[in-house]
Amino acid sequence: MPKRRDILAIVLIVLPWTLLVTVWHQSTIAPLLTTHKGEPLTDSRREAAPGADPREYCMSDRDIVEVVRTEYVYTRPPPWSDTLPTIHVVTPTYSRPVQKAELTRMANTLLHVPNLHWLVVEDAPRRTPLTARLLRDTGLNYTHLHVETPRNYKLRGDARDPRIPRGTMQRNLALRWLRETFPRNSSQPGVVYFADDDNTYSLELFEEMRSTRRVSVWPVAFVGGLRYEAPRVNGAGKVVGWKTVFDPHRPFAIDMAGFAVNLRLILQRSQAYFKLRGVKGGYQESSLLRELVTLNDLEPKAANCTKILVWHTRTEKPVLVNEGKKGFTDPTVEI
């Protein structure tokens, strides 16, 4: 009996202390568990058990959201709309090492524009196979023309007389094609835009110009030795001048990429062409626009000419010194 009483006494003494320690331990840990449960678990707080499958660890982590993969199928070019005006993009081009690269990049932009017709005019005695294949493969609606700039307007090789801006005859041929294709009193809604193959174009630009009533205008970046040139617009939303350093008193001190013309205006003013002779540098745009509109007729786009949507970029001329006179690489491989 004495031994049993000793054991009972020990149990009665130890048991309360055991219960007390257990309760205290749980009350200390519980707040920590509650806090961690509501917080994202970082790698420093939670690590996979040694030898555990990493995939199982990721699957059990509630903070990792499973990505649902969806396949998108696009139609390029977009389906033709019977309600949208057609944008006729006139692009002069000429043979050079980067020609295919320039046209490919531009085509990849135009493929996203609905109701677009690409008028590509080569400075060549005939249509070249390179350009013909490229246009055919794009899937775009296009017309392929050619006219060679006369030799007397060329200095030597690829250089040109600065009095004859590159692309003048090619743009004029495109204007003639439009007038021969559409009747003068055509009700066909459309816009004509002169887009060189080395520029960079925002898709937003094409939607801005689509509503052109007569002639719309906007800024162009990297021209005239400035970050950008732009029409000067007053508080009433009218063009009153030009933000440019080079000859700001020109009738239309604007870059070729900075305006679009309503197709009906092109058809009605059949005398309006880019002047080939007697035009100073920088006046090529004015030679056409002064036959179409006055300053007061211009429609500022791109948030009243405060947004840049086109950049006058230039591709760096490739260095091909290792080709040698005979050519190191296979000349039959098209680049």
From Swiss-Prot:
It is a single-pass type II membrane protein. Homodimer. Interacts with SAR1A. PANTHER family: GALACTOSYLGALACTOSYLXYLOSYLPROTEIN 3-BETA-GLUCURONOSYLTRANSFERASE 1, GALACTOSYLGALACTOSYLXYLOSYLPROTEIN 3-BETA-GLUCURONOSYLTRANSFERASE BETA-1,3-GLUCURONYLTRANSFERASE. Involved in the biosynthesis of L2/HNK-1 carbohydrate epitope on glycoproteins. Can also play a role in glycosaminoglycan biosynthesis. Substrates include asialo-orosomucoid (ASOR), asialo-fetuin, and asialo-neural cell adhesion molecule. Requires sphingomyelin for activity: stearoyl-sphingomyelin was the most effective, followed by palmitoyl-sphingomyelin and lignoceroyl-sphingomyelin. Activity was demonstrated only for sphingomyelin with a saturated fatty acid and not for that with an unsaturated fatty acid, regardless of the length of the acyl group. It comes from Canis lupus familiaris. Residues 28-335 are lumenal. Residues 3-5 are annotated as: Essential for transport from endoplasmic reticulum to Golgi apparatus and interaction with SAR1A. InterPro entries: Glyco_trans_43 (IPR005027), Nucleotide-diphossugar_trans (IPR029044). Mn(2+) binds at residue 198. The record marks 229, 322 as: Interaction with galactose moiety of substrate glycoprotein. Pfam families: Glyco_transf_43. The chain crosses the membrane at residues 7-27. Residues 1-6 are cytoplasmic. SUPFAM superfamilies: Nucleotide-diphospho-sugar transferases. The active site is at 285 (proton donor/acceptor). Its EC number is 2.4.1.135. UDP-alpha-D-glucuronate binds at residues 92-94, 123, 166, 171, 196-198, 312-314. This is Galactosylgalactosylxylosylprotein 3-beta-glucuronosyltransferase 1.
